[in-house]
Amino acid sequence: MNKEIIIGDWKMPECDTEASMNMWNARAQEFAKQRGVEDDDWVAALVKRHGMLPADGTFLDVGCGAGKYTVYFAKKCAEACGTDFSEEMIKSAEQRAREAGTDNAFFSCDNWHTLELAEKGWKGKFDFVLANMTPAIQSAETFEKLTEASCGWCLYIHPVLRTGSVADRLKKKIFGKKPDPRYPQLQYAFNLLWEKGLFPAVEYREHNWVRSFELERAVDIFKNDLKSKRTLTAEEEASIEKYLIEHAVNGIVEEEVRTTQFALYWEV
C-alpha cells in the first residue's frame, strides 16, 4: 500500500467539532479520577525497556487528556508537555500536576488536527512523542505530525479491535448498522513509516474495562459522541435518551468496553 493510497483512505472524517469538544469536556471529571501511572504500566514499561526518554530529554503527550502520562513522564525527564483540545481536560491535567508537585509539566490547549508545529516551535523539538488512545490522530496528516514533532522516538497506541456495549447499540439504533469493531489505523501507520524508510515495531495487548456514568452525564456524553459523527434529529436525540433511561440501574449507566490495542513505536 503506497503513500498516495493511504492518504486518500486515511483522511479526516466529517465531524461536529463542537459536539466532540462538549463530549470530552463532559468526560474530564471521569478522566481526572483515573489513578496515576505506575512503573509497571504497559506504556511506562515499554518506554523504559526501549530507552525512549532520556533523563535530560523532552516529552510531548498528544491528546493528553487529564495528564496522567504527562505527569508520570515529567518525573523521568527534564520537561514534559501535554496538549489536548478540551479545555476541561487541560484544567484537570494542570490540577493533577499541582497535586503531584510537578513543576516541569506544562499543558497547552490545542487542536492537533489544525496545529502548525513550526508556529508552535514544536517541529523536531521532543525526544519522545506519545499519542495514546487519542482522537487527535484521525488521518495520515495528523499521524505524520508525530514524527515531525520528534527528534528521537514516537509511540502510537490505538485499538485494532474495540467494542462498547452501550455505544455500539446506540450507533446501530441511530445509524442503522452495528459499527465495525476493526480499526485500520495500524496498517496505515505502519506502511506510512515503512515508506519513509523507518523501521517501526509493534506490540499488542488485551485491555477491557467497565465505565459508569450518572444518567444525566451518560445522556450528555453518548449524545455528543453521536452528534460528533453527524447532525441528529430531535427524534434521534429523544431515542438516545429513552434508551439510556431504560438501561440505567439506580440512575447509573454502565458500559463494558473490550479492546485489543497495538503499540506502534519507531525511532526518527
Q: Which role fits each region the language model picked out?
A:
Residues 201-268:
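Conserved Class I S-adenosyl-L-methionine
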